[in-house]
Amino acid sequence: MGNAMSKDVYLAPLERAAQNSLILGLFLPIQSGAWSPSTAPRGTSWTFDYNARCAVRAEQLGFDLVFGLAQWLGKGGYGGKMQFRDKSTDPLLVTAGLAALTKRIILISTVHVLYGWHPLHLAKFGATIDNMSGGRWGLNVVTGYKKSEFEMFGLEPMEHDFRYEMADEFTTVLERLWLEDDEISLDGRFWKMKNAYVSPKPINGRCILVNAASSGAGLAYAVRHSDLIFVTSPVGADPHKACEALPPHNAKIKDGARQLCRTVRTIINPHVICRDTEKEAWAQHKAILDNQDPVAADNFYKTFVGGDQASWKQATREQWVIGGNVHLVGTPEQIVDWFIRLKQAGCDGVQVNFYDFLPDLEYFGQRVLPLMRQAGLRAGLTAHAA
């Protein structure tokens, strides 16, 4: 079987999620400190047990997917007294563990595919987790960009567009290994194989593919291969400005996919701070900022604005202390209003994160999700029925 057939027919779990007007995902805090270099009180933990509780509860509440980021940091992480992100677990292994604890929710793993991976390895590992989960696994393809990370693996840093040339060949081979019934031999520009074969195949033909590119080369790659594309506000964390800037960005991505006879969906990452009153929500926002670890915050901020990631150039230091791409602060009604506006701006989904994950997730489930259903953003648990 070749790649000529539309890839969309293979995406049953994602298509079920898309029965909702707004796809709903949860970022998992698999690194110490999660998204916020702050010492304001919270119980968030990087441990597998804590993240398993988050994933299981998200599934019970009707979330469509959970997602873990990947990173490679030296001793002490981003530093500071809190040693921000000194500990981080591997998302591929975490999602493999979650496959045994969940039944319906999509499990997305982030993998830096250029840090020594061969497509055959990842095709086999991915197909295995996909079968373990009943067809619910997806891959977030990351090329890497930090000089220090490449050096950890004994590699020279690679030029930005060249990374996506490598990723394009890697992903093409990956898809062939999942989709084709014959052994594959390849003498490629970057990878070689002889009589390579993967069995069992992913349950739905091939696994869900995700990417968070924003540059020209990155988006060209993403619309060719990805089913779900993370978009980043090009104007920073202010949701008012984001909702004004996102429509042409989302339209450009979807138009690019349509030219290739493909369908892609876009999803954005809001950090949600929700309380009964607006005053309480902004008080929590202030507490996170007031208790920031200044050394960790500085290092975290400089890492992103100093790299070649086009999407983060407008981010402020305050944004990195709070975490997430856009900041949604307010009452349950206000949060839902922002979700509606993000939907109107062309986003097909939101991938939320919190400061104090389990209690904030529970509050979100009890207070925000019912309003999302009332607003027509969510169809309820029926979208997840097997």
Where are these regions (language model features)?
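Acidic (Asp/Glu)-rich catalytic clusters
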Residues: R16-Q19, E59-Q60, A96-R104, G126, ...
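Hydrophobic, small-residue-rich alpha-helical packing segments that form membrane-like cores
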Residues: K7-P13, G25, A40-P41, L98-I106, ...
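Glycine-rich, proline-tolerant flexible connector loops at the mouths of alpha/beta enzymes
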Residues: L65-T89, V113, S233-L246, V352-G365
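Conserved, mostly hydrophobic/aromatic
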Residues: L24, A58, G62, L98, ...
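N-terminal beta1-alpha1-beta2 module of alpha/beta enzyme domains
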Residues: G2-L101, K201-C207
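Hydrophobic faces of well-ordered beta-strands that scaffold small-molecule active sites
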Residues: L22-L26, V66-G68, L107-S109, W137-V141, ...
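Active-site mouth loops of central-metabolism enzymes
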Residues: A34-D49, T110-L120, E156, I203-G216, ...
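An alpha-helical appendage that flanks or caps ligand/catalytic pockets
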Residues: N3-I30, E59, H160-I203, S233-Q344, ...
